[in-house]
């Protein structure tokens, strides 16, 4: 992810509120890492900082994070548009010719990316992800990501909002796969 300066007042509170909303909406699809966002339930050392943490933090389960961003695109924009212009494909998925920038795709597509420590993440094919983490896990994360995107996009559409694309991060807590990080 490329870092941007924070010029949005209360950005942390807004992102936390949005993530809590989406976690609730999609909880029947996949469990998540949230323990609580109520600072009164945080461990004592953290409660001393309640004023700074309230509304802008979450206490979460520790996980082993899968080292890929699970990107779902419903529209052809951003880096997907750039790839399509060059190759007619996005992350190895060939798309119909003649699509226009930001056009709705016939079906949402799963386009994973590596998690870069600095700079922008690198788009990869599903096959490249499968080589790194296994075909079974890749298939499961693809199914979960597409299901979450569809549910969120359908809900947002009822509110006049279009979700062009989004990314999800997943982790392992024991044998369980859970959704981690901020959502949508």
Regions found by a protein language model. Name each.
Residues 1-165, 171-184:
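Acidic/polar, glycine-anchored loop/turn motif associated with catalytic or activation segments
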């Amino acid at each position: 992810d490329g870092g941007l300066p924070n010029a949005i007042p209360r950005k942390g509170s807004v992102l936390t509120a949005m993530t809590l909303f989406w976690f609730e909406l999609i909880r029947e699809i996949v469990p998540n890492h949230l323990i609580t966002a109520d600072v009164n339930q945080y461990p004592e050392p953290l409660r001393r900082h309640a004023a700074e943490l309230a509304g802008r933090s979450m206490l979460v389960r520790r996980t082993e994070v899968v080292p890929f961003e699970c990107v779902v695109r419903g529209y052809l924009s951003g880096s997907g548009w750039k790839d399509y212009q060059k190759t007619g494909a996005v992350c190895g998925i060939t798309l119909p010719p003649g699509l226009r920038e930001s056009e709705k795709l016939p079906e949402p597509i799963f386009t994973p990316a590596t998690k870069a420590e600095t700079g922008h993440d690198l788009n990869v094919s599903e096959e490249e992800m499968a080589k790194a983490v296994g075909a079974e896990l890749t298939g499961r994360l693809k199914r979960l990501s597409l299901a979450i995107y569809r549910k969120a996009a359908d809900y947002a559409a009822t509110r006049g909002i279009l979700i062009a694309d989004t990314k999800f991060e997943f982790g392992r807590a024991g044998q369980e796969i859970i959704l981690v990080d901020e959502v949508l």
